[in-house]
């Protein structure tokens, strides 16, 4: 079955102290529901970003912050496995309501590992 990434977006000035107990409870309830349905493969919040870029001289430069400058950043991700894109969107819709943030859904295309010799 296909896997999907659900990425939740937060404003770049997000203050975690604004999360109330009701919202945290709804997020935990949704995670329990996903686990019970057998669709959740991973879920977690994300810390600060660091960007690495190759330089013309072959070196790699590391900078603080996300690669793209934007007013929003990815605050958390969930990986789910569903039979159809519509089913993934239905779970994402529940995520929008529980987390109170916009989300993006993308199918994950797995690259096969190297053949064992």
Predicted regions and their residues:
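Conserved, structured core segments of small domains
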Residues: 1-117
